[in-house]
Amino acid sequence: MIFPEEDYVSSAKSMGLTSLAISDFATLRGTPEFVHACKKANIKPIVGVDFLIDELLFTLYVKNENGYKNLLRLFTDYHKGLVTLDNYASYTCDLIVVLSITSPKFKDAFNSDKFNYWLVDVQRGIDNFYLGIAPDKEDYLYHIQVREFAVSHTYKTVAFPFVQYLKKEDAVVLKMVEAVSENKPLAIKELEGSNYLLSNDEMLVHYTEEEIHATNEIADSVDFNLITKRGKLLEYKNDLGMTSDEYLHHLVRLALQKTGFIRRHSYVNRAKYELD
């Protein structure tokens, strides 16, 4: 995302959406802010993470507390290089798995004679499995073929747009960010793209009723609250007569003072956010 999470949630709210998903690549960094923004706007947050496994793009969404634990286990092993196409299904209990059809490896597999057998192996052991359809005018025929295959082989497809910015004209902002990060000049001042937050009417243009229904099916199946206490706070013994919670706050403040970050509001606010 190139805009704050609150902006995405606000736009979704204005469109009448009642649920919204996040899935950053191999990280949960933006998730807490996203969830807080959704709660404030009375929108149901769907928590997920993108993983590239053997050159295939998977998005895993949390169904419940057990699914969250499995996601963290997968997350840990993924960053250790231990997750492969052969074993990833063992992590997916109480997770919703969406396989993107846009990756080159998926397209190559789809064009092979053994695609059906290949996809059976990829999906084996997964209870909640969908093929993610992203709007793509250039690959319109390919999308039709994937949909036809899914119907004939009883796979579920789901509306799965790739959202990077809020409006189509915001594509130029993404180019600006890329140019700055690469220290390159940007000649263009206007640009429209396709990776924006689609309106309800636009969703109906790009997707079937079944694919839109599948998004609601996923949202309805989720019963998870990220913002909750898990386990017990460690007991911090001290000579100041403070409770463990008070002493932890005290130690964090001392650390901020020692490093000089006490003078930077962003660090202080982040510390308060984590402690609360």
Residue ranges of model-derived segments:
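Conserved active-site carboxylates
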Residues: 3-19, 41-46, 50-135, 168-276
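Alpha-helical structural signal in soluble globular domains
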Residues: 33-41, 125, 149-153, 218
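Conserved mixed alpha/beta core segments that line enzyme active sites in large multi-domain catalysts
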Residues: 136-158
